[in-house]
């Protein structure tokens, strides 16, 4: 399995890619150092090794995370060029919407019992991670489906 679950300090469970135990490489990295899922890789992979520094609830800057990649002899690239990827504005908007939602979940957790936290985490994982985004052949379709799911979840959880 190429994924594992990570419980953040906030109590929200988020999946993350499992690295190979032998050398710390991504499980999707082939022997020729190319990505096995390149055409359908998640946004976090597209932006790697960039991270986000949140200035406030809706504004962030990209930062280079040093030491995050275990690959040797990395080529250097300017941050400005890296951020020149197609659809960056849409991706950034999606990240802000997701960040806002996660913050709402974090705010709700302290008032929930341990069992209800488990139910909430399971629901969140099923809706956003375990249910396929079938039919989403491009980013536009993915964002539309994500927004549909986000609206449904916020309504069910009373987070509107």
Feature names for model-found ranges:
Residues 2-7:
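Short, small-residue-biased leader/transition segments that mark boundaries at the very start
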Residues 8-160:
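Short loop/turn segments that flank or connect secondary-structure elements
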């Amino acid at each position: 399995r190429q994924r594992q679950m990570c419980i953040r300090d906030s109590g929200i469970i988020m999946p993350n890619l499992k690295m190979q135990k032998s050398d710390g490489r991504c499980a999707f990295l082939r022997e020729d150092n190319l990505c096995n899922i390149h055409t359908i890789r998640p946004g976090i992979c597209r932006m790697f090794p960039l991270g986000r520094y949140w200035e406030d609830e809706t504004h962030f800057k990209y930062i280079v995370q040093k030491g995050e990649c275990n690959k040797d002899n990395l080529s250097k690239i300017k941050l400005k060029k890296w951020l020149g990827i197609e659809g960056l504005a849409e991706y950034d908007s999606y990240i802000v919407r997701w960040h806002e939602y996660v913050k709402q979940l974090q705010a709700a957790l302290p008032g929930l019992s341990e069992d209800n936290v488990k139910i909430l985490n399971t629901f969140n994982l099923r809706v956003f991670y375990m249910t396929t985004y079938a039919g989403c052949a491009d980013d536009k379709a993915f964002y539309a489906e994500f927004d549909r799911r986000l609206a449904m979840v916020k309504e069910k959880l009373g987070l509107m």
